[in-house]
From Swiss-Prot:
<keyword id="KW-0699">rRNA-binding</keyword>
<dbReference type="GO" id="GO:0006412">
    <property type="term" value="P:translation"/>
</dbReference>
<dbReference type="InterPro" id="IPR023036">
    <property type="entry name" value="Ribosomal_uS14_bac/plastid"/>
</dbReference>
<keyword id="KW-0687">Ribonucleoprotein</keyword>
<dbReference type="Pfam" id="PF00253">
    <property type="entry name" value="Ribosomal_S14"/>
</dbReference>
<comment type="subunit">
    <text>Part of the 30S ribosomal subunit. Contacts proteins S3 and S10.</text>
</comment>
<keyword id="KW-0694">RNA-binding</keyword>
<comment type="function">
    <text>Binds 16S rRNA, required for the assembly of 30S particles and may also be responsible for determining the conformation of the 16S rRNA at the A site.</text>
</comment>
<dbReference type="GO" id="GO:0015935">
    <property type="term" value="C:small ribosomal subunit"/>
</dbReference>
<protein>
    <recommendedName>
        <fullName>Small ribosomal subunit protein uS14</fullName>
    </recommendedName>
</protein>
<feature type="region of interest" description="Disordered">
    <location>
        <begin position="44"/>
        <end position="74"/>
    </location>
</feature>
<keyword id="KW-0689">Ribosomal protein</keyword>
<dbReference type="InterPro" id="IPR001209">
    <property type="entry name" value="Ribosomal_uS14"/>
</dbReference>
<dbReference type="GO" id="GO:0019843">
    <property type="term" value="F:rRNA binding"/>
</dbReference>
<feature type="compositionally biased region" description="Basic and acidic residues">
    <location>
        <begin position="61"/>
        <end position="70"/>
    </location>
</feature>
<dbReference type="GO" id="GO:0003735">
    <property type="term" value="F:structural constituent of ribosome"/>
</dbReference>
<comment type="similarity">
    <text>Belongs to the universal ribosomal protein uS14 family.</text>
</comment>
Length: 101
């Protein structure tokens, strides 16, 4: 089980990323635009750097939806590998069967 503070911080980051996603996309588009002047690009860069650090999607971490474990994340199921194994054994994941040959 991850620390509650880490899970809360992650939720806060997710809200910030969603809140600033459109603004960040606009500024990045200006920075990548070949027709924009150097001053416009520099101003967009300055504005982007003034946004909250946690509003960047790079700072998000994939976490287990059940207990927040940050390592061993299985993307399709949204849980950690340990939880994935438990759920598969109990038959809670449709279409997942234990291999046998």
């Amino acid at each position: 089980m991850a620390k509650k503070s880490k899970i809360v911080a992650q939720k806060k980051r997710e809200k910030l990323v969603a809140q600033y996603a459109e603004r960040r996309a606009e500024l990045k588009a200006i920075m990548k635009c070949p027709t924009a002047s150097l001053d416009e690009r520099m101003e967009a860069s300055r504005k982007l750097s003034r946004l909250p650090r946690d509003s960047s999607p790079v700072r998000l971490r994939n976490r287990d939806q059940v207990d927040g474990r940050p390592r061993g994340y299985v993307g399709k199921a949204g849980v950690s590998r340990a939880r994935f194994r438990e759920m598969a054994h109990r038959g809670e994941l449709p279409g997942i069967t234990k291999s046998s040959w």
